C-alpha cells in the first residue's frame, strides 16, 4: 500500500512473477510505473507479472468484497506463522517509511500480523524481504510450494 521505493516494488514484482501471485499496488505511489529503477529491479520478468493499480484502499476493497486481508506491521502482536492463510487472501504491506495507516490497523486489529525480530534493536525488515517471508509461508500453507 502506497510504496515509495522503486527497487523494492521491482523486487516484489519479480517475487510475484516467480510465485504466480498478483501484485496489487494502492496509490499514491512514490514513483512512476515507468521508473528505470523499478524496471531494473524487476529485470525482464515484468511481462510475467499480473499486477493491478488501485486509486486508493477503498477501491481495492470494493472490488474484492469477500476477500480476507492480513495486515503486516511491526505493531502487530500475532506472528505471521500463527495465521491460517487461504488461497484468496491478500497480504497488505505499508510504506517503507511509515508502514500502514494507524486507523487501518485499529480497524483490522485481529488481522494484523508481524514478523518477530530476534534482535530488539532492529525495528523492521526491508519491504521486499518481509513480503517474501510472509508470501512463502502463505504459499506453503495452501500447498502451492
Language model feature labels by segment:
Residues 1-145:
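Post-transcriptional modification and biogenesis factors for structured RNAs
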Amino acid at each position: 500500500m502506497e510504496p515509495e521505493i522503486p527497487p523494492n516494488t521491482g523486487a516484489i514484482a519479480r517475487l510475484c512473477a516467480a510465485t504466480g501471485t498478483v501484485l496489487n499496488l494502492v496509490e499514491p505511489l512514490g514513483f512512476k510505473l515507468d521508473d528505470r529503477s523499478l524496471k531494473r529491479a524487476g529485470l525482464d520478468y515484468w511481462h510475467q507479472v499480473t499486477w493491478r493499480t488501485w486509486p486508493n484502499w477503498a477501491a481495492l476493497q470494493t472490488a474484492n468484497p469477500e476477500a480476507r486481508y492480513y495486515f503486516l506491521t511491526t505493531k502487530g502482536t500475532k506472528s505471521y506463522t500463527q495465521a491460517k492463510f487461504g488461497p484468496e487472501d491478500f497480504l497488505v504491506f505499508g510504506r517503507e517509511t511509515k508502514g500502514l495507516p494507524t486507523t487501518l490497523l485499529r480497524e483490522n486489529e485481529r488481522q494484523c500480523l508481524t514478523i518477530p525480530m530476534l534482535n530488539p534493536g532492529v525495528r523492521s525488515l526491508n519491504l521486499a524481504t518481509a513480503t517474501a517471508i510472509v508470501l512463502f509461508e502463505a504459499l506453503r500453507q495452501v500447498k502451492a510450494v
